């Protein structure tokens, strides 16, 4: 056995920048951001959901600090999800629910060999079905897994006030403010019948469901803090439902 391999090495918060040696004597909880690569109107980047999930996960770990009983680390994000409703727009890459579910299951099975807990931090609503099925299976197999949504009450649906405000807070240089226009602001329940058959393009030519013209960085800071606090509280309580959603 190489004794040098067991030297204590400071543990960074990012899995992607860690080394195997740094992980060797630890059994951390790993937070895995799960996002998407999909259109977000003419003003937001394709990786908006991934950025939000990664930023929330990273801030949650910073809030946790370094508790004596558990280290926490943020994994590189899963940047592709179930985004079929956005495939009418260039740039969208959807792997679908079945592929995402399989990816998450195999991810959890592998990571559980060296982690204490796995938390998927979800930034895209289209991923929920895959997350629920995958985490339920992981838990059935005896793995300590859960998932949390980056959600807030009264949020609009897509690329509107909510997401644009958050991006103005976490990635202001990547919001094309001169492209801000109001999208379809009808209730989502009213739009769903047409979206099921024709996707988002059937109800919004620009791919916006909501009104980004009202977005502000200050509002984004408030919404982001609410997302972070909500996820952190769920993780601290650790009360998964039958689908692994932390409540």
Swiss-Prot record:
What biological processes does GO assign it? proteolysis; riboflavin biosynthetic process
Q: Where does a divalent metal cation 1 bind?
A: 38, 49, 124
| InterPro entries associated with the record | Creatininase-like_sf, Creatininase/forma_Hydrolase, MftE
Query: Which EC numbers does the record give?
Result: 3.4.14.14
DNA repair recorded as keyword? no
Q: Which residues bind a divalent metal cation 2?
A: 40, 49, 163
- Keyword field: Hydrolase, Iron, Metal-binding, Protease, Zinc
Effect of loss of the gene: Cells lacking this gene present delayed growth in ethanol as the sole growth substrate. Glycosylated mycofactocins are produced in this mutant, albeit in significantly lower amounts than wild type. MtfE can likely be complemented by an unknown peptidase present in the metabolic background of mycobacteria.
Supply one GO molecular-function term.
hydrolase activity, acting on carbon-nitrogen (but not peptide) bonds, in linear amides
Tell me, in a sentence or two, what this protein's role is.
Answer: Peptidase involved in the biosynthesis of the enzyme cofactor mycofactocin (MFT). Catalyzes cleavage of the MftC-modified MftA peptide to liberate its final two residues, which consist of a cross-linked valine-decarboxylated tyrosine dipeptide (named 3-amino-5-[(4-hydroxyphenyl)methyl]-4,4-dimethyl-2-pyrrolidin-2-one or ADHP). Is required for the in vivo ethanol assimilation in M.smegmatis.
Record's family? Answer: Belongs to the creatininase superfamily.
| PANTHER family reported in the protein's UniProt record | 2-AMINO-5-FORMYLAMINO-6-RIBOSYLAMINOPYRIMIDIN-4(3H)-ONE 5'-MONOPHOSPHATE DEFORMYLASE, 3-DEHYDRO-SCYLLO-INOSOSE HYDROLASE
Q: What name appears for this protein in its UniProt entry?
A: Mycofactocin precursor peptide peptidase
Source organism of the structure: Mycolicibacterium smegmatis (strain ATCC 700084 / mc(2)155) (Mycobacterium smegmatis)
């Amino acid at each position: 056995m190489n004794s040098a391999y067991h030297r204590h090495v400071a543990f960074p918060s990012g899995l992607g920048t860690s080394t195997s040696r740094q992980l060797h004597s630890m059994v951390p909880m790993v937070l895995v951001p799960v996002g998407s690569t999909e259109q977000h109107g003419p003003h937001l980047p394709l990786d908006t959901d991934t950025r939000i999930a990664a930023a929330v996960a990273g801030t949650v770990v910073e809030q946790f600090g370094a508790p004596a009983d558990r280290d926490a680390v943020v994994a590189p994000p899963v940047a592709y999800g179930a985004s079929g409703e956005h495939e009418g727009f260039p740039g969208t890459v959807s792997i679908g629910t079945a592929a995402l579910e399989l990816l998450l299951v195999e991810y959890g099975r592998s990571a559980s060999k060296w982690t204490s807990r796995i938390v998927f931090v979800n930034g895209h609503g289209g991923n929920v079905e895959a997350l629920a099925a995958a985490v339920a299976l992981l838990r059935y197999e005896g793995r300590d897994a859960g998932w949390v949504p980056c959600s807030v009450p009264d949020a609009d649906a897509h690329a509107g006030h909510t997401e644009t405000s958050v991006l103005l807070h976490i990635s202001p240089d990547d919001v094309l403010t001169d492209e801000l226009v109001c999208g379809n602001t009808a209730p989502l329940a009213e739009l769903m019948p047409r979206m099921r058959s024709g996707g988002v393009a059937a109800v919004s030519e620009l791919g916006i469901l909501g009104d980004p013209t009202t977005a502000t960085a200050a509002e984004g800071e408030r919404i982001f803090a609410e997302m972070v606090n909500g996820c952190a509280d769920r993780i601290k309580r650790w009360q998964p439902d039958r689908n692994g959603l932390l409540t």
